[in-house]
């Protein structure tokens, strides 16, 4: 598959087909090509001998998709940065990535960034001034060059830039379209922010098949009335989201085949799909296929998939995450470094062309988890699991990195920022489960000196500081105050004891 050529052919074959919809804004395939060509031409003229990544800032604006394609046509990887990401984190991404340019689809509220900022109005001028100019196709990202870089949580307090190459993305997109039987011209739900790699599961499968991306933004999700009004208008046929989002939608009785009569495929990734959620979806959408997938950001979104049928639901209380894509393979590694036999738990290791080339500018971190096996790139996921008859079963994290509502995070990073807060002497973050999956984060805090009379006021002050450093989804929901952190006999934090206090 030639990814960019495949997207561009729709500008010729179906130029007036809508490529992307967000509220009242939409772009056609013709506009997508013209504007991304104009932008790529401008980037190449401004940065002729430069291949540094480009930050793309915004939320669900159509310009985001134009900017992504404009970057890669000019030979630059893009770094998606959502509006919800705090200023401090945006600053660290800008500094660590070596980016020289930021393209914005919305007002940039972060100050003193060490990059050139191209505003929304600047972009409109570029689209107009450079209209009709086409970039040199030889300059476009290809092969093992980076296509996008997504920043994920890092245990040192600094986010890690996962480098995904053109070849990685082609392998993923081809597999998604073929294995999940996606058709030409379908409407895809775009629920995940672009800085979350789940969004890649809808963006590129939609664009290469001439589909329409129907974007749902965070304000709609916060107002269910607006959300369901948008869904009713959408005629979505391919649903891509975390299971949690679908579970939230199922609380609305009208969320069913009557609302979305042409629904064909549900693609789930990012967290555990509970058996009962899949069962309800089959009841509400009997003609749709429910697909459960698994994969870390470091292996390009997902590498396994399974069609969840009623037979699968009856057979497995905890659902399998699927069979590996044909160009990759899974190894289950025991602690001694040997490969575990069928049915035995160990660390999931992914081998093949889906695997990232590593973390941008972090060779030491890269060496810890990326390796070569039989001449192919391999990634040690840190996830526990086992394989039985070719089916992968996921058993949570081996360390303290978790998935919460689809977002991956390292508890150590949250603890790092908690301990840096003014009123905190010590802190531990404990993830609290509800059923099979994590429901919220609890912060256990040893407070420093303060003058607050009530604990809730202290909590508000700590949360205010955290809001300046971390995305909202990484901020603990509940706080508990202790005079000291309990320890195990071998000197480690006694997380089990803390957990028992909460669940008692």
From Swiss-Prot:
UniProt-listed Pfam families? AMP-binding (PF00501), AMP-binding_C (PF13193)
Annotated residues that bind D-alanine are located at 197, 301, 492
**Presence of keyword Nucleotide-binding:** yes
PROSITE patterns the UniProt entry points to: AMP_BINDING
Which EC numbers does the record give? 6.2.1.54
The pathway entry for this protein reads as: Cell wall biogenesis; lipoteichoic acid biosynthesis
Q: Which residues bind ATP?
A: 152-153, 292-297, 383, 394-397, 492
* The organism's place on the tree of life at top rank: Bacteria
A Gene Ontology molecular function term for this protein is: D-alanine [D-alanyl carrier protein] ligase activity
- Which subcellular locations apply to this protein? Cytoplasm
Q: Name one GO biological process term.
A: lipoteichoic acid biosynthetic process
> What is one cellular component GO term in this UniProt entry?
cytoplasm
Q: Where are the transmembrane segments?
A: none
EC main class here is ligase
Reactions catalysed according to its record: holo-[D-alanyl-carrier protein] + D-alanine + ATP = D-alanyl-[D-alanyl-carrier protein] + AMP + diphosphate
Q: Which UniProt keywords apply?
A: ATP-binding, Cytoplasm, Ligase, Nucleotide-binding
Looking at the keywords, is Ligase present? yes
By its UniProt entry, which PANTHER family does this protein fall under? ENZYME, PUTATIVE (JCVI)-RELATED, PTHR45398
Protein family per UniProt: Belongs to the ATP-dependent AMP-binding enzyme family. DltA subfamily.
UniProt xrefs under NCBIfam families: AA-adenyl-dom, D-ala-DACP-lig, PRK04813.1
Q: What does this chain do? A: Catalyzes the first step in the D-alanylation of lipoteichoic acid (LTA), the activation of D-alanine and its transfer onto the D-alanyl carrier protein (Dcp) DltC. In an ATP-dependent two-step reaction, forms a high energy D-alanyl-AMP intermediate, followed by transfer of the D-alanyl residue as a thiol ester to the phosphopantheinyl prosthetic group of the Dcp. D-alanylation of LTA plays an important role in modulating the properties of the cell wall in Gram-positive bacteria, influencing the net charge of the cell wall.
Q: What is this protein called?
A: D-alanine--D-alanyl carrier protein ligase
Native species of this protein?
Answer: Bacillus mycoides (strain KBAB4)
Q: Give the gene that encodes this protein.
A: dltA
């Amino acid at each position: 598959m030639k990814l960019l050529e495949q997207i561009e052919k729709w500008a010729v074959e179906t130029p007036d087909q809508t490529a992307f919809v967000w509220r009242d804004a939409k772009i056609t395939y013709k506009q997508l090509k013209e504007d991304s060509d104009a932008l790529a031409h401008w980037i190449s003229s401004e940065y002729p001998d430069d291949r540094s990544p480009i930050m793309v800032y915004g939320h669900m604006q159509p310009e985001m998709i134009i900017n992504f394609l404009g970057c890669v046509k000019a030979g630059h990887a893009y770094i998606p940065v959502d509006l919800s990401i705090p200023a401090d984190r945006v600053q660290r991404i800008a500094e660590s990535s070596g980016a020289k340019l930021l393209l914005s689809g919305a007002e940039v509220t972060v100050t003193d960034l060490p990059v050139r900022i191209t505003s929304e109005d600047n972009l409109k001028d570029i689209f107009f001034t450079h209209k009709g100019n086409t970039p040199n196709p030889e300059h476009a990202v290809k092969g093992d060059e980076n296509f996008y870089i997504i920043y994920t949580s890092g245990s040192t307090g600094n986010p890690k830039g996962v480098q995904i190459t053109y070849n990685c993305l082609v392998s993923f997109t081809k597999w998604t379209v073929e294995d999940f039987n996606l058709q030409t011209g379908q409407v895809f739900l775009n629920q995940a922010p672009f800085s979350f790699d789940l969004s890649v599961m809808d963006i590129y499968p939609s664009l290469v098949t001439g589909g329409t991306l129907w974007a749902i933004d965070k304000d709609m999700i916060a107002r269910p009335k607006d959300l369901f009004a948008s869904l009713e208008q959408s005629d979505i046929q391919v649903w891509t989201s975390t299971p949690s989002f679908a579970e939230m939608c199922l609380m609305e009785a009208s969320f069913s085949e009557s609302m979305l009569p042409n629904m064909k495929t549900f693609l789930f990734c990012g967290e555990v799909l509970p058996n009962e959620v899949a069962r309800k979806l089959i009841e509400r959408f009997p003609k749709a296929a429910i697909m459960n997938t698994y994969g870390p950001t470091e292996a390009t979104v997902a590498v396994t998939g399974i069609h969840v049928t009623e037979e699968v639901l009856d057979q497995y209380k905890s659902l399998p995450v699927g069979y590996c894509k044909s160009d990759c393979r899974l190894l289950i590694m025991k602690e001694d470094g040997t490969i575990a036999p069928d049915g035995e738990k160990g660390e999931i290791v992914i081998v093949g062309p889906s695997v990232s080339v590593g973390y941008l500018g972090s060779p030491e971190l890269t060496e810890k988890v990326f390796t070569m096996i039989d001449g192919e790139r391999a990634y040690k996921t840190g996830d526990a699991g086992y394989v039985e008859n070719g089916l992968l079963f996921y058993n949570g994290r081996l360390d303290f990195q978790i998935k919460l509502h689809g977002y991956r995070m390292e508890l150590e990073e949250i603890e790092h920022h908690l301990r840096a807060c003014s009123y905190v002497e010590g802190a531990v973050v404990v993830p609290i489960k509800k059923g099979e999956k994590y429901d919220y984060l609890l912060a256990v805090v040893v407070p420093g000196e303060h003058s607050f009379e009530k604990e809730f006021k202290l909590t508000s002050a700590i949360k205010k500081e955290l809001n300046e450093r971390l995305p909202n989804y990484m901020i603990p929901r509940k706080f508990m105050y202790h005079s000291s952190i309990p320890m195990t006999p071998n000197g480690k934090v006694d997380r089990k004891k803390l957990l028992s206090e909460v669940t008692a």
